[in-house]
């Protein structure tokens, strides 16, 4: 039986007794029906896996004992920042979840001109927390011990103005002349920009190209935004990463 994995947001030390976060405790008790003495695995983003055992269960509170620690990194040799135009509802969640499984290092949500979902104020903060929870849950499932950051939502021009010039920069465009596999092996990190439903506007594409992005296509077919991002990530891992 696969040992359940849970994210723990604070430092962990051998021999420590810690209470699982509320959501993790609820899942362990109500969904997995775990009991005292059962084994769990914890991670907190430091590229280690911590083996623990349940000491006691009190209603929704679970206390575990940290028994061992092992260095375990599942991070790709290729560092990819996904710059994703915000798509609607489940599409964005799906993109983030699968991007984590495909080894993305971080995600930058962009409030693009054609984004159907418009976020501001408290709604934006809640959505960002939701996205970070999606990413954390994906790490629990896929075995990553380092949690990719979901960066604060930004407009495209604001984000571009804050960036340097280092690394390979790739923009997915359905009618681009160059194909992804025709690009040279990147030196250092890669930034991948993918538009929302309908893609980036002409103005946004022009700005991205001005800031050093190279437009590429993925085959002769038009892909949905969630398909495009994931197909590109998988292709880059196969070409330059750990596939």
Protein language model regions, located:
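Active-site/ligand-binding-proximal alpha/beta "capping" segment
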Residues: 163-205, 213-216
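Short, ordered loop/turn segments at secondary-structure junctions
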Residues: 11, 69, 111-115, 220-221
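RNA substrate-binding interface of SAM-dependent RNA methyltransferases
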Residues: 73-170
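Structured adenosyl-cofactor binding patch, chiefly the S-adenosyl-L-methionine
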Residues: 202-243
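Generic structural signal for residues in well-ordered beta-strands
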Residues: 40, 64, 147-151, 215
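N-terminal positively charged helical leader segments and presequences
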Residues: 1-71
């Amino acid at each position: 039986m696969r040992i359940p994995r849970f994210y723990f947001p604070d430092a962990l030390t051998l021999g420590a007794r810690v209470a699982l976060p509320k959501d993790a405790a609820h899942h362990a008790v109500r969904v997995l029906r775990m009991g005292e003495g059962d084994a769990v695995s914890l991670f907190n983003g430091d590229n280690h896996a911590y083996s623990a055992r349940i000491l006691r269960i009190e209603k929704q509170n679970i206390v575990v004992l940290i028994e061992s620690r092992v260095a375990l990194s599942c991070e790709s040799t290729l560092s990819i920042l996904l710059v994703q135009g915000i798509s609607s509802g489940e599409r964005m969640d799906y993109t983030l979840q699968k991007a984590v499984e495909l080894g993305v290092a971080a995600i930058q949500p962009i409030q693009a001109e054609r984004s159907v979902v418009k976020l501001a104020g408290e709604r934006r903060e809640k959505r960002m927390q939701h996205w970070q929870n999606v990413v954390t849950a994906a790490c629990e499932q896929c075995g990553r011990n380092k949690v990719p950051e979901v960066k604060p939502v930004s407009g495209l021009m604001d984000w571009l103005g804050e960036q340097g010039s280092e690394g390979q920069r790739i923009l997915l465009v359905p009618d681009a002349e160059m194909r992804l596999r025709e690009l040279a092996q990147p030196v250092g990190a890669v930034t991948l920009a993918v538009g929302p439903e309908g893609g980036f506007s002409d103005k946004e594409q022009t700005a991205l190209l001005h800031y050093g992005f190279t437009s590429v296509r993925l085959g002769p077919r038009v892909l949905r935004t969630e398909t495009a991002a994931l197909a590109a990530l998988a292709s880059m891992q196969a070409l330059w990463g750990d596939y």
